């Protein structure tokens, strides 16, 4: 995929958890993510390549323990793959630009889409709309 940093660069610039989640398709423990309770207005971006993924307006509290969104910024920002791991069938979501693992999407979200994009904080950064401050998950 385009613009993906080298493994050495990723290991140098990401925490162990961020590398595990984005590159090894891992999952951070529920209720531990830095961006789970973030309520500020802004944009959630791919931690690896800075591609905009979700607007804060689509974030909601699903009670699942990870940041949840009902729709991505646009149809090209997310890549969808069938995930048959752990004895179940799920839809994995990855960054549409650099292929970093983000989480999964489920058909149990609120309207208007009915979808729940369940995303690891460790795969995201957040840019505050007003201040421009950036928080890494």
Swiss-Prot record:
Biological process terms in GO annotation: protein repair; response to oxidative stress
Binding site for Zn(2+): 46, 49, 95, 98
HAMAP family xrefs: MsrB
UniProt keyword terms in alphabetical order: Metal-binding, Oxidoreductase, Zinc
UniProt GO cellular component terms: cytoplasm
Cofactor binding: number and manner: Binds 1 zinc ion per subunit. The zinc ion is important for the structural integrity of the protein.
The protein's name in its UniProt record: Peptide methionine sulfoxide reductase MsrB
Top-rank taxon, per record: Bacteria
MF GO annotations: peptide-methionine (R)-S-oxide reductase activity; zinc ion binding
Record keyword Cell wall biogenesis/degradation present: no
Residue ranges annotated for the MsrB domain, each copy included: 7-129
Reaction equations catalysed: L-methionyl-[protein] + [thioredoxin]-disulfide + H2O = L-methionyl-(R)-S-oxide-[protein] + [thioredoxin]-dithiol
List of catalytic residues: 118 (nucleophile)
UniProt source species: Escherichia fergusonii (strain ATCC 35469 / DSM 13698 / CCUG 18766 / IAM 14443 / JCM 21226 / LMG 7866 / NBRC 102419 / NCTC 12128 / CDC 0568-73)
NCBIfam families, per the entry: peptide-methionine (R)-S-oxide reductase MsrB
Keyword match Transport: no
Enzyme Commission number(s) from the entry: 1.8.4.12
């Amino acid at each position: 995929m385009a613009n993906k940093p080298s493994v050495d660069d990723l290991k140098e610039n990401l925490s162990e958890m961020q590398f595990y989640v984005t590159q090894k398709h891992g999952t951070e423990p529920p209720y531990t993510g830095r961006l789970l309770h973030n309520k500020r207005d802004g944009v959630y971006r791919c931690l690896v390549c800075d591609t905009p993924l979700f607007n804060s307006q689509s974030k909601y509290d699903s009670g699942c323990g990870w940041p949840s969104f009902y729709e991505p910024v646009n149809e090209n920002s997310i890549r969808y793959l069938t995930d048959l791991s752990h004895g179940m069938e799920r839809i994995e979501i990855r960054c549409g630009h650099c292929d970093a693992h983000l989480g999964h999407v489920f058909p149990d979200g609120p309207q208007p889409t009915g979808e729940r994009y369940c995303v690891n904080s460790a795969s995201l950064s957040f840019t505050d709309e007003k201040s421009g401050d950036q928080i890494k998950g």
